[in-house]
Each structure stands twice: as structure tokens, then as C-alpha cells.
Regions:
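Gly/Ala-rich phosphate-binding loop of Rossmann-like dinucleotide-binding domains
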Residues: 7, 11, 116
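Short, hydrophobic alpha-helical segments
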Residues: 228-235
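C-terminal boundary of histidine-terminating zinc-finger modules
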Residues: 207-220
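Residue-level signature of catalytic and energy-coupling elements of molecular machines
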Residues: 21, 29, 62, 85, ...
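Phosphate-binding loop that captures ATP/GTP phosphates
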Residues: 13-71
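Conserved catalytic-core segment of NTP-binding enzymes
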Residues: 94, 98-99, 105-196, 201-205
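Phosphate-binding/switch loop-helix module in NTP-utilizing enzymes
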Residues: 65-115
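Hydrophobic positions on the alpha1 helix immediately C-terminal to the Walker A/P-loop
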Residues: 2, 6
Length: 235
């Protein structure tokens, strides 16, 4: 839910925002933003066919999830997946956006390399959970974006699911997945640490209901606004 909530935060700050769900094999943004029933339509411009993106909370969204049955396993080889992604990127009728957030799957595979080669990325934000096995993925991600042939600025790291605070014990923090692994790595390699996001029930409920918790939960909105302000300041 980080991408959806971050996008909505940027929108509440007055920016025009679009989201491209680049997680071809496991798209979720259309569900998180309440657009599951959207049926894409096409339009022509200058003799070229374009897809009209979904509109949700005054944001634009394009996802492969609009074109597949949610119960079907997507068994595409790498070339087929990357070609689909190129179409979603280049043949969507995006409006005049200030930010296009591209939600990528974990790892450093074909999807990431396709995005890097197809569009000039202004920066990468890497999301991790605190445990060491997750931080190992962060290490690979940072190294990929920093590679001399890639050279995409790493704007920072977000630590998601950082701790849990029960309502009945508001002064207690329980570090269920370990403590501060992503923060420690960010400090070690000189990458900005953008902030922590705790485990909050409203975030999970919002992901399921299609209503991001930003704008509903003031505590969650505060976490995301601090992160969004740091990202904007770095660009």
C-alpha cells in the first residue's frame, strides 16, 4: 500500500499524480484504489491508439490488472511481460502529470531493466521491511540503480511495517520484524532514510477496501506527508 498512499499524499499536496502498476505478475494498485471494475477504453490521437487510464481520487492509474481475469495465473515469459509493460507506459493517455509513480515488484529483473531503458527516471524510492532478508533485496536494488550503466538517483529508503503499537498500549512499540534494518543500511551506504511506517490496522483495511488510509487516518497521513516532503525536496 506504500505506492497508493504516497501517491494520494502527493495529490493532497497539490501535485498531479499518475500511477503505473509495473508489477505485471501480481498487480494490486487497481484493487487498492478501488478501480477493480474499470474497463479501459481506447482513443486515437495523431493516428495512434491510446488507452484511457482509470481515474481514482483525482489520480490516473494504469495496470495490467484491468486486462486479465484476477483468478488467472499470468504465465508470460520475460519478453511478453516487458512488451506489455512498454505498451502500458507509452500507449496510455497520461495527462499533464507532475509525478508518475511506477510500482515495481521486488528484485532486479526484466521489469526493472525495461523501465530503466524505456524512460528517464528522476529517482528510485526503495521500500523494505526491517528484517535482514528483506534488506538484502534493498542492497541489490540500490546497487542496480547506482550502477554506472543505469545511474538512477536513489532518493531514499522507506522502512515499512517498522513496528506495531496496540491501541490499548499507545506508549509501547513492538518490533515484530526486527528493528531498524533498512535505516541502518541507508546510513551505512549514504542513502537518505525517508522514514518509518508502522503496522497500522487502517492501512491494511484501506488496502482491502480500495480506500487508502491517507485522508482517513491522521497518524498515517502524517508519516506519509513527512516522506513525501523529503522526496519532493530531493528532486
Amino acid at each position: 500500500p506504500v505506492t497508493a498512499n504516497l501517491a494520494l499524499t502527493l495529490r493532497t499536496m497539490g501535485y498531479r499524480v499518475g500511477i503505473l502498476d509495473a508489477d505485471i505478475y501480481g498487480p494490486s494498485q487497481h484493487k487498492m484504489l478501488g478501480c477493480e471494475d474499470y474497463i479501459p477504453e481506447a482513443m486515437q490521437k495523431d493516428g495512434q491508439d491510446y488507452i484511457i487510464p482509470a481515474q481514482s481520487m483525482d489520480m490516473e492509474l494504469m495496470s495490467i490488472g484491468f486486462f486479465i481475469n484476477p483468478n488467472d495465473a499470468l504465465m508470460w515469459r520475460g519478453a511478453m511481460a516487458t512488451n506489455a509493460l512498454k505498451q502500458l507506459l507509452h500507449q496510455t493517455m497520461w495527462g499533464g502529470l507532475d509525478f508518475l509513480l511506477i510500482d515495481m515488484p521486488p528484485g532486479t529483473g526484466d521489469i526493472h531493466l525495461t523501465m530503466i531503458s524505456e524512460i528517464k527516471l528522476d529517482g528510485a524510492v526503495i521500500v523494505s521491511t526491517p528484517q535482514q532478508i528483506a534488506v538484502a533485496d534493498v542492497v541489490r536494488g540500490v546497487e542496480m540503480f547506482r550502477h554506472e550503466q543505469v545511474n538512477v538517483p536513489v532518493l531514499g529508503i522507506i522502512e515499512n511495517m517498522a513496528w506495531f503499537t496496540p491501541k490499548e498500549l499507545p506508549d509501547n512499540k513492538y518490533y515484530i520484524f526486527g528493528k531498524g534494518g533498512a535505516r541502518a543500511y541507508a546510513e551505512e551506504v549514504g542513502v537518505p532514510f525517508l522514514g518509518d511506517i508502522p503496522i497500522v490496522q487502517s492501512i491494511m483495511e484501506g488496502s482491502e477496501s480500495g480506500q487508502p488510509s491517507v485522508g482517513v487516518d491522521a497518524e498515517v497521513e502524517r508519516y506519509y506527508r513527512e516522506i513525501a516532503q523529503k522526496i519532493v525536496a530531493s528532486l
